[in-house]
Amino acid sequence: MSKAAQLLGEQILALNIGYLTSDKEDNELYTPYYAVDHIVKYLPKGKIIWLPFDEEWSAFYRRLTELGYRVVRSSLAEGQDFFEYEPEHWDLIVSNPPFSIKDKVLERLYSFNKPFAVLLPLNSLQGKTRYKYFKDGIQILSFDARICYHNKEHMDSVVKGSPFATAYFC
């Protein structure tokens, strides 16, 4: 076997191990700071950013307030359900919504008719349900590698082996 074929085989095996060992059941994956930093340069200062799925300790909330952005946040834990609650004043949404309800989230986002940037799996581009939203155009801000998210058990470090690629859908 050639060295190139062996290397390719090792890379495929590494991807499979990452997929097989990652937690695909937990719907709560938290965004690391480097993924927030990726979107910051595209966010206008002076606008109010709504973080609809964020606690005070989230990387989105901490980084954006640290950088002087005007931020309003809400969370289900505080009785503010994204599908029923809307802050009085806001200009755009930035978030990492629960992937398992992405269709419902997209429907609500488009109903506002305001700008948004949400992290979603890249395969979210596919599907008849989402086509009605994306047919007139969608902007994608992608990463050069898969995001390693945090989960409840690993808040001080990232969890390696994400089973999917994610990007900002804008």
In which residue ranges do the predicted regions lie?
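Class I S-adenosyl-L-methionine-dependent methyltransferase catalytic core
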Residues: 1-170
